[in-house]
């Protein structure tokens, strides 16, 4: 898509003259006026030019009448302060495009020949309380002012107790392979798609409630979600976004005293828990299972219609009239999925339930259940206690990604000619090489390496092996490699600052000095200034803080007592994972995990 560069030059401001409240600038391509808030930074010396570069896509210009600050961020003055002013578009794209379940009664059943069922959320019986929200999602994606969170209509909306004009709540029908076997119809058993919102940047977001009541796809469930799993979904998706991972987003966390009974560890001991609702967003909630159920049921016309829709709206780089568009679609998903999983591996993230019904066709991370981040580096780490065989362990994620791609190929096969079907295994075979290339690209960055050399794979593999042997912390080892100077690393990490606890663990390995020598030689002749740049590169990609299970558990336990301070504080800290934050350090978030962290168990129960 074309991009336009708008350069505003020759705005002369004298510091001796009082700045006007707003500088008006005319957008040269669309003849619309936008405004820039004046600050002292905008008061330049005499004859000094102020140059501002603004980029906008062809149909995504700056919003007329909106106010922007010097960082090109839209002022809060232009946001909606009431949900009565905010609304979904009059055209509900999904509702108007696809056949909808003709049965309006809300009862569990097998559904045929549709993509969605129309069904309303079930209001909470007890008072809904908004306990946390993401301001970046609220203002940046949904154009809402923070003050709206203090209003009853907003809380009722995000709780599923009411819905707004233009909303047609839908539950999506899909299937999926769960733990390797076909499970038939699954679908949104406790989620309601409220509508599609197009924000002022031209971005399209689908808003979905999770934990909002029964649907035709609830199977044996009650349609609700408990507080502990909802806290994890809310914090997990936002933490992943700030780590630079493609992911769904979370707007809000609502809690109620509605009693929910769950057998958390499937041991025959159910207990009562609080209900919670998360409002989450994604450009699309279609997943591999969305296509699988149509292919399995031989609903080929509907399958073709759905894939064409997804290509048209989410893969615009593909010619929607091309006879080979389905192969191009599959190839793009192969590429993006390989990168997504390489990104997971690079931050020590294990999803926990990589079923095809939890795997986005847009290759974004969705459905945060029993996920976890590595503490000590253990390739066999299994975050999900329900995963008895370790199918979804950290080290097997790339392999499972390939399995899921093959299931996607099976779902697309009915749309292809015989010669095209023969291309599927060839495209699939490229997944491994793409993943390996992306993996090495990311780990080179984690080590501050520039360019690519043959010994890089050995340097990375040797480091990971030493980390496994010494049970070194995955996140903090990489972070501290970016803290210590190369000169100090070459001498002896054990002589380094005592705060470098992860490197102290690593340095106990008998091969550490040999690895440090190879790593230093790979960096070539680094002078002090170049070494500082290496460390800066590393600190920009290696987080200081991640959502460790023990941190999430502490927030959940506080929330269970009605104290949501830890949830809010964690969100604030996780928004800046690459920065040093004294308040986080005071809580021990960059320290060695406590011993009791090893005993935390997370299951599929939610």
Regions found by a protein language model. Give the residues of each.
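Active-site-adjacent bridging/hinge elements
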Residues: 106-113, 205-216, 307, 311, ...
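Conserved ATP-binding subdomain of kinase catalytic cores across diverse folds
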Residues: 127-131, 135-319, 361-366, 374, ...
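ATP-dependent phospho-/nucleotidyl transfer catalytic cores
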Residues: 229-230, 260-263, 267-351, 362-465
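Hydrophobic residue at the +6 position relative to the catalytic HRD Asp in the kinase catalytic loop
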Residues: 354-359
């Amino acid at each position: 898509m074309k991009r336009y560069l708008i350069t505003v030059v020759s705005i002369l401001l004298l510091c001796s003259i009082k700045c006007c409240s707003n500088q008006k600038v005319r957008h040269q391509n669309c003849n619309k006026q936008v405004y820039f808030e004046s600050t002292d930074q905008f008061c330049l010396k005499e004859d000094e030019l102020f140059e501002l570069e603004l980029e906008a896509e062809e149909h995504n210009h700056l919003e007329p009448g909106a106010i922007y600050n010097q960082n090109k961020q839209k002022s809060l003055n232009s946001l909606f302060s009431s949900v009565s002013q905010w609304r979904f578009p009059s055209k509900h794209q999904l509702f108007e495009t696809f056949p909808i379940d003709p049965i309006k009664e809300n009862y569990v059943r097998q559904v045929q020949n549709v993509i969605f069922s129309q069904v309303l959320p079930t209001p909470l019986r007890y008072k809904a309380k908004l306990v946390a929200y993401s301001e970046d999602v609220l203002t940046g994606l949904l154009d809402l002012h923070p003050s709206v969170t203090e209003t009853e209509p907003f809380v009722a909306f995000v709780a599923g107790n009411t819905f707004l004009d233009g909303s047609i709540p839908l539950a999506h029908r899909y299937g999926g392979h769960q733990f390797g076997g076909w499970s038939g119809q699954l679908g949104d058993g406790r989620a309601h798609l409220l509508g599609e919102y197009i924000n002022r940047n031209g971005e399209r977001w689908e808003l979905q409630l999770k934990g909002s009541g029964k649907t035709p796809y609830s199977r044996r469930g009650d349609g609700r979600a408990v507080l502990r799993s909802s806290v994890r979904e809310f914090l997990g998706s936002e933490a992943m976004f700030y780590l630079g991972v493609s992911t769904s987003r979370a707007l809000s966390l609502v809690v109620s005293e509605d009693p929910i009974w769950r057998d958390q560890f499937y041991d025959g001991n159910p207990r009562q828990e609080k209900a919670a609702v998360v409002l989450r967003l994604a450009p699309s909630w279609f997943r591999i299972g969305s296509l699988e159920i149509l292919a399995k049921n031989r609903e080929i016309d509907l399958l073709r219609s759905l894939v064409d829709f997804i290509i048209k709206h989410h893969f615009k780089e593909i010619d929607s009239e091309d006879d080979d568009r389905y192969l191009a679609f599959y190839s793009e998903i192969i590429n993006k999925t390989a990168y997504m999983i390489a990104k997971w591996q690079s931050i020590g993230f294990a999803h926990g339930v990589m079923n095809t019904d939890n795997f986005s066709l847009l290759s974004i991370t969705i459905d945060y259940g029993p996920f976890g981040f590595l503490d000590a580096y253990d390739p066999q780490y299994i975050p999900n206690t329900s995963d008895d065989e370790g199918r979804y362990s950290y080290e097997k994620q790339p392999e499972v990604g390939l399995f899921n791609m093959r299931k996607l190929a099976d779902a697309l096969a009915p749309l292809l000619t015989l010669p095209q079907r023969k291309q599927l295994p060839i495209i699939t075979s490229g997944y491994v090489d793409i993943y390996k290339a992306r993996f090495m690209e990311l780990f080179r960055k984690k080590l501050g390496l520039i360019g690519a050399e043959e010994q890089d794979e050995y340097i990375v593999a040797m480091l990971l092996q030493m980390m496994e042997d010494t049970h070194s912390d995955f996140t903090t080892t990489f972070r501290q490699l970016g803290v210590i100077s190369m000169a100090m690393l070459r001498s002896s990490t054990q002589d380094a600052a005592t705060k470098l606890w992860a490197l102290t663990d690593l340095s106990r390995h008998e091969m550490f000095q040999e690895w440090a020598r190879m790593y230093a030689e790979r960096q070539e002749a680094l002078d002090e200034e170049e070494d500082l740049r290496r460390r800066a590169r590393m600190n920009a990609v290696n987080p200081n803080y991640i959502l460790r299970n023990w941190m999430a558990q502490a927030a959940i336990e506080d929330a269970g007592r009605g104290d949501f301070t830890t949830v809010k504080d964690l969100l604030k800290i996780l928004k800046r994972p690459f920065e040093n934050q004294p308040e986080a350090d005071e809580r021990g978030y960059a320290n060695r995990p406590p011993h009791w962290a090893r005993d935390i168990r997370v299951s599929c129960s939610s």
